[in-house]
Regions:
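Vicinal oxygen chelate
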Residues: 2-26, 46-96, 104-131, 142-148
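Conserved active-site tyrosine of GNAT-family acetyltransferases
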Residues: 35-40, 107, 135
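Short glycine-/small-residue motifs
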Residues: 137-140
Length: 148
């Protein structure tokens, strides 16, 4: 392979990689309206979309760069948060947070359900964990040195 081909391949790979900007967890929920209300009213998210118009069963809620997708399936398909499968799998989503302190205070005032209040955890992360209306646990943390 020539140097030109290698450089072109690397450039193509870098261009492709730079297209990845975010990931959104997709949570199965029991009651879509109740789940949307929890994220909007308690956690300050905005409803980005829902559909389809004739039979709404999915939605996306967003706050800044964090987006969570919600979907109701059928009455017999219930939410299955990670912690229900094993105690070590306690997070369903991790949101990098530049400054968790004011967010923690806001959530506390809004009546959000906390799994773990603002603190350092053993791997040096500073932040907190919340539980949504369907039992999913979302972690809001930053590294000890202040970086996300």
């Amino acid at each position: 392979m020539s140097a030109t081909t290698t450089a072109s391949t690397t450039t193509d790979r870098e261009a492709t990689t730079s297209n990845l900007v975010a990931i959104s967890p997709f949570f199965i929920v029991k009651d879509l309206k109740a789940s949307i209300a929890y994220y909007v009213e308690r956690m300050g998210f905005e409803l980005e979309f829902q559909g389809p118009p004739d039979d709404v069963y999915y939605a996306g809620v967003k706050r800044e760069a964090a987006c969570i997708m919600l979907k109701t399936i059928t009455p017999d398909v219930l939410p299955q948060p990670n912690h229900t499968r094993h105690e070590w799998a306690r997070w369903d989503a991790y949101i990098y947070t530049l400054d968790p302190d004011p967010l923690f205070s806001e959530f506390k005032q809004r009546g959000v359900s906390f799994v773990k209040e603002l603190s350092f955890i053993d791997n040096g992360l500073w932040g907190f964990e919340v539980r949504d209306a369907d039992g999913y646990v979302i972690a809001f943390f930053r590294l000890r040195d202040g970086s996300p």
